[in-house]
Swiss-Prot record:
The modification N-acetylmethionine is found at residue 1. Component of the nuclear pore complex (NPC). NPC constitutes the exclusive means of nucleocytoplasmic transport. NPCs allow the passive diffusion of ions and small molecules and the active, nuclear transport receptor-mediated bidirectional transport of macromolecules such as proteins, RNAs, ribonucleoparticles (RNPs), and ribosomal subunits across the nuclear envelope. Due to its 8-fold rotational symmetry, all subunits are present with 8 copies or multiples thereof. NUP157 may be part of a NPC subcomplex containing NUP53, NUP170, and NUP59. In addition it may bind to MAD2. The lineage of its organism: Eukaryota, Fungi, Dikarya, Ascomycota, Saccharomycotina. Functions as a component of the nuclear pore complex (NPC). NPC components, collectively referred to as nucleoporins (NUPs), can play the role of both NPC structural components and of docking or interaction partners for transiently associated nuclear transport factors. This is Nucleoporin NUP157. Its main location: nucleus. Belongs to the non-repetitive/WGA-negative nucleoporin family.
C-alpha cells in the first residue's frame, strides 16, 4: 500500500525565448517605430495608470496599495483586509488570504469593453520579427513538413484540392479530387488515405453526432461532400493508443448541382447545416437517423431559408422551365438582385445562433431551434456605416466602399462577453465587434459596439514624441490622438479568410512583407516580386492581460512571426486558457497559467504545419531575469514575486535562473525595488513604525504586507484554484444492475501526483528559507505589533498552510495506492448500511479540498477515523506497525501524532493476540495486556468506532472481565476531572461544554453494558450443575461473577448510576436488589422522586433490609405522589405502609412511627371516601357521559383534598352519606349543617320510589333507612356531632305515623347494628318519653323491646333483675321501669 515519497517533479520547462539585445528597462517603449527613428524609443502619451476601472463590489473588499521604494516605480497590488490577524488560527488566516485573492482573480475586468479603446487602440507594435523581445506574445515551437508522399499525391490533382485541420483528432486533412488524406500531426510519418469515394470531394467537416444516435465510442462524424452526394462517416479515436477508425454508415444525401461550399454543426443538438455555391444564400440542414420507414429515409436534407412553396417543388424542375431562374429568385425572396452566395458559416455554440457571411459581405444571423432557423438579422455595409457614425468613427479609408470587404466572421462566446455576439474581420485588418440580444424566439438587432483598427506607420510617427515611463508625466503632448491616425492609414493588412480570433481576443492573420521595407503590402501583383521581394509572415495581436488586470487599461502586444508559406488555416490546438466561465476573470492568464495547458496554435501552410505557443508570464519574467523592471512596470511587484517564486522552484531550470529568481524574491532589486511590509503612514524610505497599528477588533488596516507575501499567496491560490472549492470524495447511488454504491476520489491519481509534487517543492523551499521570511511570530492576541511582525504572522500562516496541503494530498495519494480497498472501505463506513449515520455521511461527502487543507476539529476527527481503518486493514494483512508509523509521519504528519503511534502499536499487539489464541493462550494474554496498556495511554485519541472494534476483539478472546476493567479506566482517562458528573449535577444543560465528556463516558459505558448483557444471556442459557443438592458454578456463572465483581469494585458514582439506569431501562431492575454496593440505596432514593418503578424498588429494598419505617415512609409518599397510579394502588400502598408501621419494633423510632401512622390513617380515610365516590360516579346515570368519564378519571388518580371531593362531587351529586363521612374525617362540628344533611338524607329516602311495586311504602323506607344508618353509624358513631343519635331517633320515630306500622325493635335494632350501645339508647328513649318528644307511644314500644334485648345480651343485667320483671313487661311505664334502679345503683354513665 505504501510507497516512497514522490521524488520526480513535474517539468513545466519550455523552450527559452531569446530576448533581443536591445531589451532593457524600456519594455513599454516598444511602440511602432520606423527606420528613420534610429532605434530611439517611440513613447505613448497615455499612462496605463490613467484609467483604472474596478468593480464596486471588489473595491469594497480590496484596496490599492503601493509597494515600491523609488517614486518613479508604482506597483498596483492587492491589500487584503483580514480581520483578527493576530487572533485568528494560522490555517484559517492563510485560508482567508487564499480565498480573498481567489475572489480577486475571478473578478478581473472584462476583456472587450468599448471604453478601453473608444479613442483608439494602444499597441505595443514592431514590424520586425520578434521586435517586442520578451513581450512577444507567441513563439514558434515546431515546424513539421507535410510528407513528400502526401504532397506528391496533391500535385497530381486534376479538379480540386483543399486542406485543413481536424482539431479534435490532431489530424490534418488534405483532399485531392476524390481522395481524402488524414495526416497525423503528432506523427508526421503516419497518414491515412481514403480513396473509395467515387466523385470529387468539395468539402469535408468533422462534427459532433446527434445525442443518443450512435454508440458511445462514436464521438465524431466525418461529413464528406462531393459533386453528387454528402456522405456521413463515423470516426472513433482512441486518445491513449491514437488509433483511428473510420466506418461507412451507408448514410448519404443527394446534392447534385449544389456545389457544397460550407458545412458546420450545432454541437448541443447535433444539427448539421450546409450551403452550396450554386444555391444563393440558402441554408440547408442535413438530417439523419438510425431507423427507416415507409415515409422517411434514414437521411435527407431540408432547406431552412426558402419559402414553403419553393421547398416543396423539385430542386431541378424550376430552373429548367422558361423564366425559371426568375421564378426561383422570387420564391427565395431575392428577386432583382445579383447572384449572392454564402462564403462562410459560423455557429455561436453558447447561444445557439448561426451566422452566415455572403460574397457581398452581408452577415445574416439566425436563431437555431429544433424546427430549423428563425431570422435572419442582417449586417451589411450600410448598417456598419450607420454604426460607425454613431461611434464617431467616420471617413476611414480602411472602411470605404471601395476597400470594404469582410474576410471572416468569428462568434464570441457568452463566457467571454455577455453582450458581444460577433467579431467581423475586414480584408483591411479592421475588427468590428457587434453586440446583440436574444430571446427564446428570436434574435434582437445586432449593433456595432466597437472598432479596432490595425496599427499603422502614421500612428507610429505621431506618437514617437510622446515618450513616458510609467509613473512619469508625458514630456511632450500632441493634439492628434491615435484613433485619427489609425483610421486614416493608407497602409493596411491584406487579410484573408484564414484570419481568425482565438479566445480570449487573440487576433491572427497572414501578411506579405517586402524584403527591403518595413511597410506592409496591400497585395501582390507580380509572381517574380513575390518570389524575390516578398515573404509570408504571421501577424498576431494579443491583449496584454496583465496590464488589463492591474490597471484596467487595454493594450495589445502586436508582432510579426516567421512562417514558411502561404497560410491555409489557423486553429487552436489546445483549449482556451480562460480562468473562469464568466466575463469577469475570463482573460486572467496570470491565474490560469498553472492550471490550464499553455495555448498552442496550429498554422497550416501549403507545405508544413507550424505550431506556435503562447508565452506565459513566467517565460516573460525568465527572459527578463537580469532586469525585471519592465515586468514590474506592467504587472506589479506581487505578480513579479509570484513568478519569481515559481521560477525558483521550477524543475529543470538552470542554477543561474533559480538563484536570480530567489535573489529577487528575497530582496527585490537593491537600491531600486525593495520588498518589505510597510505602514500606510510611512512616506519615502522611513523605517517601519513600532506604534500600535491595530484597532480594537484586531484588524490591521494600517499595515500593508509585502509583495513577497502576496506573491507567495497568489502562487498557492492559483496552483489549487481548480480544486479549492471542489468536493474531495464522490458518491454515486447504485443502479438496479449494480451491486453496490460507487465511491471514489474526485480527482485522478495523476492530478494528485501533480499537485503533490508541486506543493512538495514549495514546502521544501519554505522550510529551507523560512528564517529569511519569518523572524518573530508574536503571541496570539497581541495588539502592539510592527509591520514586520504582521508579515511574520501572515507568512508563518502561509507556510503552515503549504505543509497542511502537502499532508492532505499525501493522504489522498495513500488512498490511491490501493484504491479498490479504499472504495470498499468507504462503502463499509459510508454506505447505506455503514457504520456512520446519514448526517456524518452527508458531511463527509460535502468535504471540499479547502476543508481538507485547513481542517477543523470535526474534519480531522473524521479523516483520522478513516485512516485508522486503513491502518488496521494493513496491520491485519501483516504490515509492521512501526513501518506504518514511519510512513505516516513522513507523508502527512498533521494527521499522525504520537498518540496515534501508540494506537497503531496497540493494534499490532491486538492482532498478535488473535493469532496466538489457538497456539499459545499465555502469549495471547500477554499481547492483550500490552495492547490494553497502550490503549489506555492514548485513550484521549481513540475514537468510538476504533474502541468498539478493539472491545469486540477482546470479547471474542473471552477477555470480558479485564475488558470491563479496561473500559472503566478508559472512561476515567478521557474525563479526568469527572466533568460528566458535574454536567449531570448542573441539570444537563445542552449548552454546557461538559456535555462532551458526558457523551464520551456514556459511549464507553454502553460498551460495558453490552458485555454485561452478553454474559447474562450466556448464563441464562447454561444451567449450573449440582451434585447432592450442592450447586456447582459453571464456566458461564463464574464468568458472570467475575464481571460483576469488577463492576462492583468501581468507586465511580456516575458509572454506578449509569449502570443502574441501564438495568432499569432493560427491565432488569430486580438485579438491583441483589447487588452488594454502597451506591444502590442512594441511587434508589434519588431516582425514586421521578420514577414509579424505582420507588417500588426502593420500598422493597428497604423492606428487604428491614428498614420498616423508611419503607413505610416511601409507600406513604408513593400513595400521595403525582405518579400515574390508580386509586386502588394508592390504597394498597397505604395498607402496606400501615402494616410496616405495625411491624416496626424500634423504640428510637417510636415518635416518628406514631406520626407516620397517623398520617397514613388520615390519608387512608380520605382515600376510602374517594374510592366510594369513584364507585358511585361509575354507576351514575344523572350526569353527562363525557363529564362522568372526566370525573371518573379524576377520582381514579391521586388522593384529592376533602374540599375537592365535597365541592366537586359529593355535594353537587347529593351523596349525603359521603358528605357525612367527609364531615367526620374533617372534624366538622356545625350541628345545624350536619342535621340539615341528615334531614335531606331522610327525606330523599322517603321520597325514593320503592324498588318493589307490591311492597308497603313504610317498610321500604324502614329498610332503606336501616341500611343507610348502619353504614354511616359504623364509621361515624364515635362522633356525636356527625352521628346525632338523639336527633336521628326522634326523626325516625316521627316518620312512623302509625305505631302499628313498625315492628317491635325495628328502630332500636338499626342503631344497635350501627354500633350504638343499649345504655345510650335507653337514656335517649327515656328522655324522649319523659319530655314527650315526638312519637312517644312508639318510643315506649321501642323501650320495651330495648330492655328485653338488653336483658338477653347483658349477663350483668340478668344478675341484677329477676326474670319475672322482664317477662311481665308489656307496656313501658317510667314508674315501673325494671332497669331504672339498676342504672342508678351502678351509676352507669352514658357509653
Amino acid at each position: 500500500m505504501y510507497s516512497t515519497p514522490l521524488k520526480k517533479r513535474i517539468d513545466y520547462d519550455r523552450e527559452t525565448f531569446t530576448a533581443s539585445a536591445s531589451l532593457g528597462g524600456n519594455r513599454l517603449r516598444n511602440r511602432p517605430r520606423d527606420d528613420q527613428n534610429n532605434g530611439k524609443p517611440n513613447l505613448s502619451s497615455r499612462s496605463f495608470l490613467s484609467e483604472r476601472k474596478t468593480r464596486k463590489d471588489v473595491l469594497n473588499k480590496y484596496g490599492e496599495a503601493g509597494n515600491t521604494i523609488e517614486s518613479e516605480l508604482r506597483d498596483v497590488t492587492t491589500h487584503v483586509k483580514i480581520s483578527g490577524l493576530t487572533s485568528s488560527e494560522p490555517l484559517q488566516l492563510a485560508s482567508e488570504f487564499v480565498q480573498d485573492l481567489s475572489f480577486r482573480d475571478r473578478n478581473t475586468p472584462i476583456l472587450d469593453n468599448p471604453d478601453y479603446y473608444s479613442k483608439g487602440l494602444d499597441y505595443n507594435f514592431s514590424d520586425e520579427v520578434g521586435g517586442l523581445g520578451a513581450f512577444t506574445p507567441f513563439q514558434r515551437q515546431q515546424v513539421t513538413n507535410i510528407p513528400d508522399e502526401v504532397l506528391s499525391q496533391v500535385s497530381n490533382t486534376e479538379i480540386k484540392s483543399d486542406m485543413g485541420i481536424f482539431l479534435e483528432l490532431n489530424y490534418c486533412w488534405i483532399t485531392s479530387d476524390n481522395k481524402l488524406i488524414l495526416w497525423n500531426i503528432n506523427n508526421s510519418s503516419e497518414y491515412h488515405c481514403i480513396d473509395e469515394i467515387e466523385h470529387t470531394i468539395l468539402k469535408v467537416k468533422l462534427v459532433k453526432p446527434s445525442p443518443n444516435t450512435f454508440v458511445s465510442s462514436v464521438e465524431n462524424l466525418l461529413i464528406v461532400a462531393t459533386l453528387f452526394d454528402i456522405y456521413i462517416l463515423t470516426i472513433s479515436f482512441n486518445d491513449r493508443t491514437h488509433e483511428l477508425n473510420i466506418f461507412n454508415t451507408g448514410l448519404k444525401v443527394n446534392v447534385t448541382g449544389f456545389n457544397v461550399s460550407n458545412i458546420i454543426s450545432y454541437e448541443r443538438t447535433g444539427q448539421i447545416f450546409f450551403t452550396g455555391a450554386t444555391d444563393g444564400v440558402n441554408v440547408w440542414e442535413l438530417q439523419y437517423n438510425c431507423s427507416e420507414n415507409l415515409f422517411n429515409s434514414k437521411s435527407n436534407k431540408i432547406c431552412l431559408t426558402k419559402s414553403n412553396l419553393a421547398n416543396l417543388l423539385p430542386t431541378k424542375l424550376i430552373p429548367s422551365i422558361p423564366g425559371g431562374k426568375l421564378i426561383q429568385k422570387v420564391l427565395e425572396g431575392d428577386a432583382g438582385t445579383e447572384e449572392e452566395t454564402i462564403s462562410q458559416l459560423e455557429v455561436d455554440q453558447s447561444r445557439g445562433v448561426l451566422h452566415t457571411l455572403s460574397t457581398k459581405s452581408i452577415v445574416r444571423s439566425y436563431l437555431i431551434t429544433s424546427n430549423g432557423l428563425v431570422g435572419p438579422v442582417l449586417i451589411d455595409a450600410a448598417h456598419i456605416r450607420r454604426g460607425m457614425n454613431a461611434l464617431g468613427v467616420k471617413n476611414s479609408p480602411l472602411l470605404s466602399n471601395r476597400a470594404f470587404k469582410i474576410a471572416k466572421i468569428v462568434s464570441i462566446s457568452m463566457c467571454e462577453n455577455n453582450d458581444l455576439f460577433l467579431a467581423v474581420i475586414t480584408t483591411t485588418g479592421v475588427r468590428l465587434y457587434f453586440k446583440g440580444s436574444i430571446s427564446r424566439r428570436s434574435i434582437g438587432s445586432l449593433k456595432l459596439d466597437s472598432v479596432k483598427f490595425p496599427p499603422t506607420s502614421i500612428s507610429s510617427s505621431l506618437e514617437q514624441n510622446k515618450s513616458f515611463i510609467i509613473g512619469h508625466h508625458p514630456l511632450n503632448t500632441h493634439d492628434t490622438g491615435p484613433l485619427s491616425t489609425q483610421k486614416a492609414s493608407s497602409t493596411y493588412i491584406n487579410t484573408t479568410c484564414a484570419s481568425t480570433i482565438i479566445s480570449p481576443g487573440i487576433y491572427f492573420t497572414c501578411v506579405r512583407k517586402r524584403a527591403n521595407s518595413g511597410e506592409l503590402s496591400k497585395g501582390i501583383t507580380n509572381k517574380a516580386l513575390l518570389e524575390n521581394k516578398e515573404e509570408h509572415k504571421l501577424y498576431v495581436s494579443a491583449p496584454d492581460y496583465g496590464i488589463l488586470k492591474n490597471y484596467g487599461k487595454y493594450v495589445e502586444n502586436t508582432a510579426l512571426l516567421d512562417t514558411t508559406d502561404e497560410i491555409k488555416e489557423i486553429v487552436p490546438l489546445t483549449r482556451s486558457f480562460n480562468y473562469t466561465s464568466t466575463p469577469q476573470g475570463y482573460a486572467n492568464v496570470f491565474a490560469s497559467q498553472y492550471s490550464a495547458e499553455p495555448l498552442k496554435v496550429a498554422v497550416l501552410t501549403s507545405n508544413a504545419l507550424e505550431i506556435y505557443c503562447y508565452r506565459t508570464p513566467d517565460e516573460v519574467f525568465e527572459s527578463l531575469i537580469e532586469n525585471p523592471l519592465p515586468f514590474i512596470h506592467s504587472y506589479g511587484l506581487s505578480e513579479a514575486c509570484s513568478t519569481a517564486l515559481y521560477l525558483a522552484c521550477k524543475f529543470n531550470k538552470s542554477e543561474h535562473i533559480k538563484s536570480s529568481a530567489l535573489a529577487f524574491f528575497s530582496a527585490g532589486i537593491p537600491g531600486v525595488v525593495e520588498i518589505k511590509p510597510k505602514s500606510s503612514r510611512e512616506s519615502g524610505s522611513v523605517p517601519p513604525i513600532s506604534q500600535n497599528l491595530f484597532d480594537k477588533s484586531g484588524e490591521c488596516d494600517g499595515i500593508v504586507l509585502s509583495p513577497r507575501f502576496y506573491g507567495s499567496a497568489l502562487l498557492i491560490t492559483r496552483l489549487f484554484s481548480q480544486i479549492w472549492e471542489e468536493r474531495v470524495f464522490v458518491f454515486k447511488r447504485a443502479s438496479k444492475t449494480e451491486k453496490m454504491d460507487a465511491f471514489g476520489i474526485s480527482i485522478t491519481r495523476p492530478q494528485v501526483e501533480y499537485y503533490l509534487s508541486s506543493i512538495s517543492v514549495l514546502a521544501d523551499f519554505f522550510n529551507i528559507h523560512r528564517p529569511s521570511f519569518v523572524s518573530f511570530v508574536p503571541p496570539k492576541g497581541s495588539n502592539a505589533i510592527t509591520a514586520s511582525d504582521a508579515e511574520s504572522i501572515a507568512m508563518n500562516a502561509l507556510i503552515l498552510l503549504i505543509n497542511s496541503i502537502k499532508d492532505a494530498l499525501s493522504l489522498i495519494n495513500v488512498f490511491y495506492e490501493d484504491i479498490d480497498a479504499f472504495k470498499s472501505l468507504l462503502n463499509t463506513l459510508m454506505g447505506a448500511g455503514g457504520v456512520y449515520d446519514s448526517k456524518t455521511r452527508e458531511y463527509f461527502f460535502d468535504l471540499k479540498f479547502h476543508d481538507l487543507f485547513t481542517p477543523n476539529a470535526k474534519t480531522k476527527q473524521l479523516i483520522k477515523e478513516i485512516l485508522i481503518e486503513v491502518v488496521n486493514a494493513n496491520i491485519a494483512s501483516g504490515t509492521s506497525a512501526d513501518y506504518i508509523v514511519n510512513v505516516l509521519k513522513e507523508r502527512f504528519g498533521s494527521f499522525c501524532h504520537s498518540a496515534d503511534i501508540l494506537c497503531y502499536r496497540a493494534g499490532e499487539h491486538l492482532e498478535a493476540a488473535q493469532k496466538f489464541e489457538m497456539i499459545d493462550s499465555k502469549i495471547s494474554r500477554n499481547h492483550l495486556d500490552t495492547a490494553i496498556d497502550l490503549y489506555e495511554r492514548c485513550a484521549e485519541n481513540i475514537e468510538l468506532c476504533e474502541l468498539r472494534r478493539v472491545v469486540d476483539i477482546m470479547v471474542k478472546l473471552n477477555y470480558q472481565p479485564k475488558t470491563v476493567g479496561f473500559l472503566l479506566r478508559f472512561a476515567d482517562k478521557i474525563d479526568k476531572g469527572n466533568q460528566a458528573q458535574e454536567y449531570v449535577s448542573r441539570g444537563c444543560n445542552t449548552a454546557d461544554p461538559r456535555k462532551v465528556f458526558y457523551d464520551k463516558r456514556i459511549n464507553v459505558y454502553t460498551l460495558i453494558f453490552e458485555i454485561v448483557k452478553s454474559v447474562d444471556d450466556y448464563t441464562s442459557i447454561e444451567q449450573s450443575p449440582s451434585i447432592a443438592n450442592i450447586s456447582i458454578f459453571s464456566p458461564a456463572s463464574s464468568l458472570k461473577k467475575r464481571v460483576y465483581s469488577v463492576i462492583m469494585n468501581s468507586n465511580n458514582r456516575f458509572f454506578h448510576y449509569c449502570f443502574y439506569d441501564w438495568l432499569v431501562a432493560n427491565k432488569r431492575q430486580d438485579y438491583l436488589l441483589r447487588l452488594d454496593s454502597q451506591f444502590v440505596l442512594p441511587y434508589l432514593k434519588e431516582r425514586a422522586e421521578k420514577s414509579l418503578e424505582i420507588s417500588n424498588l426502593l420500598w422493597f429494598y428497604l423492606f428487604k433490609e428491614e428498614h420498616f419505617l423508611e419503607a413505610a415512609d416511601v409507600l406513604y409518599a408513593l400513595a400521595s405522589s403525582d405518579f400515574d397510579l390508580k386509586l386502588s394502588e394508592r390504597i394498597e400502598c397505604l395498607a402496606r405502609a400501615n402494616g410496616l408501621c405495625d411491624s416496626s419494633t424500634s423504640f428510637d423510632q417510636k415518635p416518628a412511627l406514631v406520626q407516620l401512622s397517623e398520617n397514613i390513617h388520615e390519608l387512608f380515610d380520605i382515600a376510602s371516601i374517594q374510592d366510594d365516590l369513584l364507585n358511585l360516579v361509575r354507576n351514575e346515570t344523572r350526569i353527562d357521559e363525557d363529564y362522568r368519564k372526566q370525573l371518573t378519571l379524576k377520582l381514579n388518580g391521586r388522593v384529592l383534598p376533602l374540599s375537592d371531593l365535597f365541592n366537586d362531587c359529593a355535594d353537587p351529586l347529593d351523596y349525603y352519606e359521603i358528605k357525612l363521612r367527609i364531615f367526620k374525617v374533617s372534624q366538622f362540628k356545625d350541628e345545624k349543617v350536619i342535621q340539615g344533611e341528615w334531614n335531606r338524607l331522610l327525606d330523599s329516602m322517603k321520597n325514593a320510589p320503592s324498588p318493589d311495586v307490591g311492597s308497603v311504602g313504610q317498610e321500604s323506607f324502614l329498610s332503606s333507612i336501616s341500611n343507610t344508618l348502619i353504614r354511616i353509624g359504623k364509621t361515624t358513631r364515635d362522633t356525636d356531632v356527625v352521628f346525632p343519635v338523639h336527633f336521628l331517633m326522634n326523626k325516625i320515630l316521627e316518620s312512623f305515623i302509625d305505631k302499628s306500622s313498625a315492628a317491635d325493635g325495628s328502630v332500636c335494632s338499626m342503631f344497635l347494628l350501627a354500633g350504638v350501645s343499649h345504655l345510650k339508647l335507653y337514656y335517649i328513649l327515656s328522655r324522649i318519653i319523659e319530655n314527650s318528644e315526638g312519637n312517644v307511644e312508639l318510643a315506649k314500644k321501642e323501650m320495651v323491646w330495648l330492655i328485653k334485648d338488653w336483658y338477653q345480651s347483658d349477663s350483668d343485667l340478668r344478675g341484677s333483675i329477676a326474670p319475672e320483671q322482664i317477662k311481665k313487661l308489656e307496656k313501658y311505664d317510667p314508674n315501673t321501669d325494671p332497669v331504672q334502679d339498676y342504672v342508678k345503683d351502678r351509676h352507669h354513665g352514658l357509653k
